[in-house]
Amino acid sequence: SGNWAEDDGNIALFIADNEQLEAAAVSKDILLKISNGVEPHDICILCKQKPQDYASAIIEELEKHGVRARIETGYQDLIKEPIVDLFIKFMICADSRKHPNEWTFIEELLVELWGISGMRENDTFDEMQRKLSAVVNVVKKNIQQKLDTEQWHSTLNSIIDFFGIGNIKAKFPAYKQGTYFMNVINQFESLFFEEYVAAHGVWNLAIENFRGDHSVPIMTIHKSKGLEYNAVYFIGLEDSAFWNFRNQPDEDRCTFFVALSRAKASVTFTFCKKRTGMKCPMQRHNAINEFFDLLQRPGIAEVKRFQNR
């Protein structure tokens, strides 16, 4: 990472005639890495512009082979929310008591939210533990049956009511602003339920899938700040993705090197000659040709071409 040295890892440039060839090549490469022991969540697909415009064919191709790739737009910020972190930890405890770290986190947060003195011996603490066990058992009973949207809604509300909306907002002042708190809750409620349905009601799998434990994340370069992955695929090294290059060359060069620095072992750039879903389907790399010159220098990148037969 950082400044790329030749022995830092593998760099490749895939040049494809169309999205289907690009998707097949990228998917095959990802599947090979997974078969060699790389976890899906340690592989990342990056785009300069909207991921759905560049990665849809790849998502479909991977799905055919049982690998899920997920555009992280809705999930990424949500997972960092304190209230979502609390929900997830609470649901982990409801699913199984074999998670002492999550259990301790919830107890300590309750002590703070309810203003209990931290003495574990006192009666108030014992009372809190009893109430916590009771509500955890109710949630456990709920999640052991197949939930519909209404039951899921009331289960979530019972967790919120237990901690207390006022207490939560006092602890996390950002939630006092307008409808922000309810927006976060509603977003979590619908996204998590989607995962729950997709996991056929298997609770711990729904939690893992919501966290992205088993999927290949897809995001913009901008959203990848501070993250590192074993393998990175930058989809769309094309003029139309870097449409403002002439006005902001330094910023866009930085983007190119950020893609390199996200990767621990390998980075692959793709250029697709024709993207049918785009306003201008035919793609070029005239404006950003310096990137191609760099990648095509001897010893830098392995260049592979995928052409219509």
Language-model segments: which ranges?
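Helicase P-loop NTPase motor core
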Residues: 1-65
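Conserved short internal alpha-helix adjacent to the catalytic or cofactor-binding core
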Residues: 6-14, 58-65, 74-111
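Conserved nucleotide-binding/hydrolysis micro-motifs of P-loop NTPases
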Residues: 49-53, 76-78, 239-240, 274-277
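A short acidic (Asp/Glu
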Residues: 51-59, 82, 229-230, 279-280
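Extended, charge-rich low-complexity interaction segments
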Residues: 96-128, 203, 293-305
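Accessory C-terminal helicase-associated subdomains
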Residues: 116, 122-223, 244, 300
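C-terminal accessory regions
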Residues: 129-146, 238-309
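Conserved helicase core region in the C-terminal RecA-like lobe
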Residues: 191-247, 251-262, 266-274
